[in-house]
Amino acid sequence: MIDKSAFVHPTAIVEEGASIGANAHIGPFCIVGPHVGIGEGTVLKSHVVVNGHTKIGRDNEIYQFASIGEVNQDLKYAGEPTRVEIGDRNRIRESVTIHRGTVQGGGLTKVGSDNLLMINAHIAHDCTVGNRCILANNATLAGHVSVDDFAIIGGMTAVHQFCIIGAHVMVGGCSGVAQDVPPYVIAQGNHATPFGVNIEGLKRRGFSREAITAIRNAYKLIYRSGKTLDEVKPEIAELAETYPEVKAFTDFFSRSTRGLIR
């Protein structure tokens, strides 16, 4: 169904069964598949292809030649009706690709809200991207990667399958991430290694001086104490009792499967 207030350019193809919300804009030469939902106020500039079982929220801006919901590149994929879900107010720039999930990975590729996906960024099958993240030009997420809120991934950076990028992380450009990056950390290189805490980013987001100090102390326990991760976990958990921001580390440890960058 196409809402009466939506605009669909005469050269665009919106297949029967698609849902186009109020005040949405489907620009020239766009293709919208039959199982696609486009939310209120979302704009497809031109030459955008959205197919598969894909739901896109409201007030997104999607630029030319982006491809969303296409068949993934997992050789095990056999045509199952797996999905893509995208939240609200995202800016998805030229030639971004976001692939549908796989049955083996839960069947869903999910992008939250208020993200900036720059030119040529790639989000593979079964990835989860949180809110207010930035993927710079040519950043590439392999399958099953998780990117937590406020993370920034630099241009030309590749993230290995099943890795987790923690909240408020900043990964420098041209990096290769092969293990999990704990929250608040700056990482750079191939293979990516830690370079301290993202202090400037935390200041901009309103973290108190005391909270930043506690986060730095947790970082030092992980990377500079000479102890194993299992040895420092109780100390970090104790620190989190006073500073809730530190709890992001303990939650992260419970999710990590690939080990931490070193």
Curated annotation (Swiss-Prot):
Pathway terms, separated by semicolons: Glycolipid biosynthesis; lipid IV(A) biosynthesis; lipid IV(A) from (3R)-3-hydroxytetradecanoyl-[acyl-carrier-protein] and UDP-N-acetyl-alpha-D-glucosamine: step 1/6
Enzyme Commission identifier(s): 2.3.1.129
GO cellular component term of the entry, any: membrane
Reactions listed under catalytic activity: a (3R)-hydroxyacyl-[ACP] + UDP-N-acetyl-alpha-D-glucosamine = a UDP-3-O-[(3R)-3-hydroxyacyl]-N-acetyl-alpha-D-glucosamine + holo-[ACP]
InterPro entries (alphabetical): Acetyltransf_C (IPR029098), Acetyltransf_C_sf (IPR037157), Hexapep (IPR001451), Hexapep_transf_CS (IPR018357), Lipid_A_LpxA (IPR010137), Trimer_LpxA-like_sf (IPR011004)
Gene Ontology biological-process entries: lipid A biosynthetic process
Entry superkingdom: Bacteria
UniProt GO molecular function: acyl-[acyl-carrier-protein]-UDP-N-acetylglucosamine O-acyltransferase activity
Subcellular location(s) per record: Cytoplasm
SUPFAM superfamilies (alphabetical): Trimeric LpxA-like enzymes
Keywords for this protein: Acyltransferase, Cytoplasm, Lipid A biosynthesis, Lipid biosynthesis, Lipid metabolism, Repeat, Transferase
Complexes and interactors: Homotrimer.
Function field: Involved in the biosynthesis of lipid A, a phosphorylated glycolipid that anchors the lipopolysaccharide to the outer membrane of the cell.
HAMAP family per UniProt: LpxA
NCBIfam families, per database record: lipid_A_lpxA, PRK05289.1
Family recorded in the similarity comment: Belongs to the transferase hexapeptide repeat family. LpxA subfamily.
Protein name, entry field: Acyl-[acyl-carrier-protein]--UDP-N-acetylglucosamine O-acyltransferase
Annotated organism of origin: Shigella boydii serotype 18 (strain CDC 3083-94 / BS512)
